[in-house]
């Protein structure tokens, strides 16, 4: 399994404990923030869990969580570093050398099933798995014509019936 306790009988409970520890204790402690931040971060994670994959609109996330719109991008970075989410960026670069965030994903498929099983759409699960596996050794960016781009190659993630239409105009698809 993805986590060292993946075969334990109490797997789901243990995973939820890891999530709670990370969001409510670890990140706020690292930021030297108060306990109330942990609750807001967990709220942000749940909004992401129920919406993924989606293009983040900071104002809407702020309204849904009570977190300042200006703080949300930083908190998303901390959540990403903690292994809770993944941010798919475009390849433009920008001031910080990071492209604009195009989509948010939960970090791995286990988190999908633990946090929001009712939103465990198979397409979401496929994209999350692809992103989780490919980003280890590759710089994965969003594609303007499909789902992902890696080293100039375009990837469309789908089931048997998806076909090639989405990537037919890709130079390398």
Stretch-by-stretch model annotation:
Residues 1, 31, 156-158, 165:
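Proteins with a high burden of low-complexity, intrinsically disordered sequence enriched in S/T/G/P/A and R
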Residues 3-146:
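Accessory nucleic acid-recognition modules appended to NTPase machines
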Residues 141-145, 158-173:
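Catalytic cores of nucleic-acid endonucleases
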């Amino acid at each position: 399994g993805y986590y060292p306790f993946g075969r334990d009988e109490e797997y789901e409970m243990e995973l939820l404990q890891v999530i709670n520890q990370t969001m409510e204790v670890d990140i706020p402690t690292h930021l030297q923030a108060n306990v109330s931040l942990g609750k807001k971060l967990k709220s942000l994670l749940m909004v992401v869990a129920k919406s993924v994959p989606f293009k983040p609109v900071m104002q809407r996330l702020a309204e849904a969580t009570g977190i300042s719109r200006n703080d949300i991008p930083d908190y998303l970075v901390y959540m990403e570093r903690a292994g809770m989410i993944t941010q798919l960026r475009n390849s433009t670069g920008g001031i910080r050398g990071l492209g604009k965030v195009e989509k948010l994903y939960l970090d791995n498929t286990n988190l999908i099933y633990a946090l929001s099983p009712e939103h465990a759409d198979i397409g979401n699960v496929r994209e999350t798995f692809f992103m989780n596996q490919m980003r280890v050794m590759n710089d994965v960016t969003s594609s303007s014509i499909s789902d992902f781009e890696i080293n100039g190659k375009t990837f469309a993630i789908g089931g048997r019936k998806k076909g090639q239409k989405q990537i037919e105009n890709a130079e390398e698809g």
